[in-house]
Amino acid sequence: MKLAILGAGCYRTHAASGITNFSRACEVAEMVGKPEIAMTHSTITMGAELKELAGVDEVVVADPVFDNQFTVIDDFAYEDVIEAHKEDPEKIMPQIREKVNEVAKELPKPPEGAIHFTHPEDLGFEITTDDREAVADADFIMTWFPKGDMQPGIINKFIDDIKPGAIVTHACTIPTTKFYKIFEEKHGDLVTRPETLNVTSYHPGAVPEMKGQVYIAEAYASEEAINTLFELGQKARGNAYKLPAELLGPVCDMCSALTAITYAGILTYRDSVTQVLGAPAGFAQMMAKESLEQLTALMDKVGIDKMEESLDPGALLGTADSMNFGASAEILPTVFEVLEKRKK
């Protein structure tokens, strides 16, 4: 199998968050006895996993940065990073972040510059600056592109070079539905003709070097292609999940924090209403839908930054407390504390 990786990534944004580390990369490095994998990041980590753990025999990375300032920081011994991550990653991560932030001050952002700790060629990858060269005869094309509105212009340069039946994936910078539309405009309806292309996701749900997981979107690829990618993901990432394409963003992107809170609220509310009060599920669903729809309508009407002007958070303290029983009691006390701090 040939894997084409389009976009090598840059560590500066990972360092800037102040919370990421190399836990998964170090785990893989130890599993396969290749310390140089320990400080890979972004698509390079996922490419190394696919090569070493899933048997992908050809990996090509394409990025214009290879003709510019692709910078490899070699201040840290891979073995030291691995040992630190066995105990507490924060024993070494502050020094790594400090160095990255220092280098980032002088280095241009992608595609003119990028920060890495291992060169892809040292992992047995081929490199190129030509996306068309990379995707030629590729079975799996993993994209790691900038913001969604820039992607059609990038993709249209190589879309004619993708072989029929190839799997094409995106990560965190575009929804699957929008990613699919780019290919649909060129190839037509891929849902009923997936042999043309199989469009889905290989979304890590976090920085790949930190967590071993991948999320695969269903809807725009054949069942065979989804299953193939799922099996590769299980072998390479350790944990793989299939989910409807429209849920990928809410589950994997920044709004996952809100999705988690909302979903936990729905599930605990449902159980309190149906199991304790004995109300039918249809009634619980009707009330839940009203809550979600009206809060969304309020946000759309006044803006997320002005919601408190129309609905005082304190207004819920004297009403929601009457539902503080059963499963809802698992989360409501913490919710009340948050609302109390924000009430007018």
Swiss-Prot record:
Any coiled-coil regions, as ranges: none
Function description: Catalyzes the reversible reduction of methenyl-H(4)MPT(+) to methylene-H(4)MPT.
Origin: domain of life: Archaea
Name assigned to this protein: 5,10-methenyltetrahydromethanopterin hydrogenase
Family, per entry: Belongs to the HMD family.
InterPro entries per the UniProt record, alphabetical: 6-PGluconate_DH-like_C_sf, HMD, HMD_C, HMD_C_sf, HMD_N, METHMP_Hmd, NAD(P)-bd_dom_sf
One MF annotation (Gene Ontology) recorded for this entry: N5,N10-methenyltetrahydromethanopterin hydrogenase activity
KW Iron (keyword) present: no
Pathway assigned to this chain's UniProt record: One-carbon metabolism; methanogenesis from CO(2); 5,10-methylene-5,6,7,8-tetrahydromethanopterin from 5,10-methenyl-5,6,7,8-tetrahydromethanopterin (hydrogen route): step 1/1
Organism listed in the record: Methanothermobacter thermautotrophicus (strain Winter) (Methanobacterium thermoautotrophicum)
GO biological process: methanogenesis, from carbon dioxide; one-carbon metabolic process
